[in-house]
Amino acid sequence: MTPARASVCQTAKEEKILKKYGVNELRKMFLEFFESKGHLALKSFSLVPQNDKSLLLINSGMAPMKPYFTGAEIPPRKRVTTCQKCIRTGDIENVGKTARHGTFFEMLGNFSFGDYFKSESLRWSWEFLTEVIGLDPNRLYPSIYLDDEEAFEIWNKEIGIPAERIFRFGKEDNFWEHGAGPCGPCSEIYYDRGEKYGCGKPDCTVGCDCDRYIEIWNNVFTQFENDGEGHYTELEQKNIDTGMGLERLATIVQEVDSIFDVDTNCALRNKVCEVAGVEYLKDEKTDVSIRLITDHVKSSTFMISDGIMPTNEGRGYVLRRLIRRAARHGRLLGIKGNFLAKLSEEVIEGSKDGYPELEEKKEFIFNVLNNEENQFSKTIDQGLKILSEMENKMREAKEKTLSGENAFKLYDTYGFPLDLTKEILEEKGYQVDEEGFQKSMEIQRTQARDAREVSNYMGADATVYDEIDPAVTTEFAGYDHLSFESAVTVMTTETELVSSLVEGQKGTIFVEKTPFYATMGGQEGDTGVISTPNGTFQVEETIKLRGGKFGHVGHMVSGMISDQDIVK
């Protein structure tokens, strides 16, 4: 991306030349600044957490650093800096409805593992914001923990901030801890965006819930150990963990209203408008769809580039939900046919400077998006028709809740996910009996389990598996990795060994090495996706046969997969 790109964004209301630095420039400036302070600049970690089952997706700059902070691993250097790609979906229902919510963001951070502490951290933060970026010091306000006198002295005496401009807050705002373990106070830096973003109240100041004073950088000082009972002792090794949202910084530097107006997001947002043939800021309902698609296609692109595939569970389901929400809102805007890959191309163009792997994997990303859109388009039209009929019946009966049985019918028969049913109905003032849905789901699972025991896995004839060469085995590596490449060793339909499977066929795929856990020991097997650039296979169950063979039972969603193909 070139600096000129930061000046091409415009809204439907007015043309506005963006000020100073683009997102890619800010990222580069931050990393280079901390490299000049002796930090090792690491590339962003994958969105898939490594050896951390507490997280579904990386959601902060600190998350991949946990092994270094806990001492489980030795950091490559005591001073490290990163720009970490992150996904948070806790507020997914609000994405699009407001201009402040999003699922994808980048977190700038500098970290010290037993090296420098408060003085350097705060002075460098101030130096970067005021001298490197050039923000007005008079619009910056630090906050500290109530009794953190050390931080106060640094801000007041070393940096020269008047005492009345330093705000003291309690534990809820300025102390970082999660139960027992390392913890400590933090110091945040706020930026005053001006009266037009304020609430108008006479007491509006730092800490107000309005959009005038926004927190842009948080410095966490890990200096205590909490024993879990409220007793704190000083840590021998004190650490620094800081975080600053790149997109939020860009809104300030570029003097724009929201994260959807910063240069890279604005270019993507404008592409959405171009593809849909609509304008931004003309109609609020249209704006919701524009913002949602902008956010979701960006998140989806980054998730797929990290090897996450659309599935019905875990992080794969997060991806599937993002793609399908974007696809549905594209239809609401009047877009015909597949369009997400075209938008993903804009994501890649805007972010490849910082994430070159996007360019390297773009064809794979496009294939996954197209396959998922194709699969979704087969279900959504019929599902919407059936849901509309159910709505009419509820309206006639003056009911406000869709029964769990009907919601499950949409899911089981027409492939209509519960969250999509909920979203559509909530827009019209209805709700769903989720408890009833779960009961119907459990009944179906029990019936399916009983049927499998009678008919030998998904209806397949056991003699098909008996024909497989006894020398064929599968290495299970799911404890260490959730996704990797492997070679196909055997393929079957429900009745015979085959050399390939094509779209619409049911069958079983065996590979050399798999991350899929098989049904055994009372635990359900994994589901997911096996794919190549030419085809996608939906794994509906994983079974384990004699001799250590793991069979992935399911159906071809699109394209073709052949024996000896390298799949992911």
What are these regions (language model features)?
Residues 2, 9, 14-568:
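A glycine- and charged-residue-rich anion-binding loop/surface
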